[in-house]
Amino acid sequence: MRCPYCSSEDSQVKDSRPAEDGNAIRRRRICPDCGGRFTTFERVQLRELMIIKKTGRKVPFDRDKLLRSFEIALRKRPVDRDRIERAVSGIVRRLESSGETEIPSEEIGLQVLEALKSLDDVAFVRYASVYRDFSHAEDFEKVIAEISAKIARDPSE
C-alpha cells in the first residue's frame, strides 16, 4: 500500500486485528522509506453502490463521507469512536444487502437520522437541522419537543 506521507509504494504491516465486530480488518502499517505510521481498514464490499442526489446526479457511494457526516454531527459529544464505526457499518451493510445498486440520498439521510437518534440527541438535532433544512427557530423547537416527549415516555434513554 502506498505511504500517505512520502508516496512510497512499499509499506509493511506491523499489526492486524479484527475491527467493527469482525466486519473489517484494522492494519497498522509503517513505511520503510520515511518511517511514517498509518492505519488502514479492509472491508468486504458486496456491490458497487451509486447515490442518487436530489438533483438526479449519480455519484459513487463513499463510506468515508458517511463517516464524516457522523463525525461532524457528533463533534465534541461524548460518543465513542467504536459506536460511530458500528453505526456507519450498520448503514453500509443495510444498503449493500438491500439489493438495490442505486440509492436516493434521502434514504441514507433518514438512516443517519435514525442512527443518531439512538447515539446522541444533540447530534440528532444538529444533523436534522441541515438534513431537513431548518430555517426557523420553530423547526428546532418541534424536533426538541419530539425528543422531550420520547424521554418522558421512556426516561431510561
From Swiss-Prot:
GO terms for biological process: negative regulation of DNA-templated transcription. Residues 49-139 form the ATP-cone domain. A zinc finger (unnamed) spans 3-34. One of its GO terms (molecular function) is ATP binding. It comes from the Bacteria. It holds the Pfam family Zn_ribbon_NrdR. Residues 11-21 have a biased composition (Basic and acidic residues). Signal peptide: none annotated. Negatively regulates transcription of bacterial ribonucleotide reductase nrd genes and operons by binding to NrdR-boxes. This is Transcriptional repressor NrdR. It comes from Sinorhizobium fredii (strain NBRC 101917 / NGR234). The lineage of its organism: Bacteria, Pseudomonadati, Pseudomonadota, Alphaproteobacteria, Hyphomicrobiales.
